[in-house]
Amino acid sequence: MVTFEYRFDVLPGKLKEYEKYSKGAGKDIWLKFKGVKAVRVYKSMLGGSSPQRLVQVDLESLAALETILTDPGFRKVKVVFHGLVTHVSDSLLTQVSDKRK
């Protein structure tokens, strides 16, 4: 399993559009694809800190991620997303430890 993580800020003046997007075209976009195991979305509790949002997508494999990123429907939604956000960065993560109390 791999985790694709991306972080971003909503562009100033675009919050309402972003919220509309996240309830419309962007809603559950990842979960529509085979190979996605879980999606977690986080929002900063500190208000003005950057990044304001963080999304983690757990996938069965890198191949699943590649299939999603090249899907024409996903790419179309991604273009809309990038018109609403800034300071986008991403990472591919693999878990090395999980300790719980």
Regions found by a protein language model. Name each.
Residues 14-41, 73-81:
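Short amphipathic alpha-helical segments
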